[in-house]
């Protein structure tokens, strides 16, 4: 049995990369398969960097892939291991370990002192990460809310005006500023650029994803924001009308005043108006604002967990 780890070749390996990733992740019902068009949009984006992308071949046939990714816009001591993704029928033959070890070497060679890995919380994934020397540092919850009813009178700020903004350049710039001001104390924060924020809106349009942006205003000044929406590909995959609340932030001086509750209630109502029957959001258990408990009080329930693991490369 021979395992070869080779570099990803741009364009030539695109279809192969998508096929491996889609087949490897198909066991997760929340995963929406990627198309070649999706991958092309990803390649045009500000985060794409093929430097650390590798493909594994087992006895001459494609078996898996992984990405030793570095955020070029961040001044970080760590890089990221994305994957490894291995075809289901070829697992437990050393392919995933070979891909991971190659990624760790790649990041070390490129000057990184640590590496982060994130994965679905299940025994197989946890054991694999532990075998590579990783330790868990954060737990990320995916939480869902049935939209048969939207909570009201739960302490939301009555003085805040919740305004829906158009997806134009002014909104992109405002959202970018609010995101940076709201999340600067959070885990793995680094400043978001206007170009990155604009890219998210552009790709949503091109993929026919519905997005909406709500801003909370006090005395006409923006103090918080929420971005939500729905992806028709995800709806088709999961078999029901599910929408997401993708980002929620409140400026630090205005926290604990019910503004996040007001934004959440308006976001849930907006999803329901659009015909969604379920809402989903994500939260880090270590979130300094205590957001997990806020979501629980509003009726969100945890449906799955993702772990962030780390290890030194020195």
Spans of features found by a protein language model:
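Conserved acetyl-CoA binding element of GNAT-fold acetyltransferases
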Residues: 76-88, 238-252
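Active-site rim helix/loop that mediates acceptor-substrate recognition in acyltransferases
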Residues: 21-22, 28-58, 62-70, 190-218, ...
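Short amphipathic alpha-helix that is part of the acyltransferase structural core
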Residues: 1-41, 55, 62, 155-192
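Active-site/acyl-donor-binding loops of N-acyltransferases
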Residues: 132-152, 265-269, 273-314
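Glycine-rich phosphate/pyrophosphate-binding loop shared by adenosine-nucleotide-utilizing enzymes
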Residues: 61-65, 79, 220-225, 243
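Conserved acetyl-CoA-binding loop-helix of GNAT-fold acetyltransferases
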Residues: 86, 92-105, 250, 256-269, ...
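Conserved hydrophobic beta-strand within the GNAT/NAT acetyltransferase core sheet
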Residues: 81, 115-119, 245, 279-283
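Acyl-donor-binding surface of acyltransferase catalytic domains
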Residues: 1, 61, 72, 88-160, ...
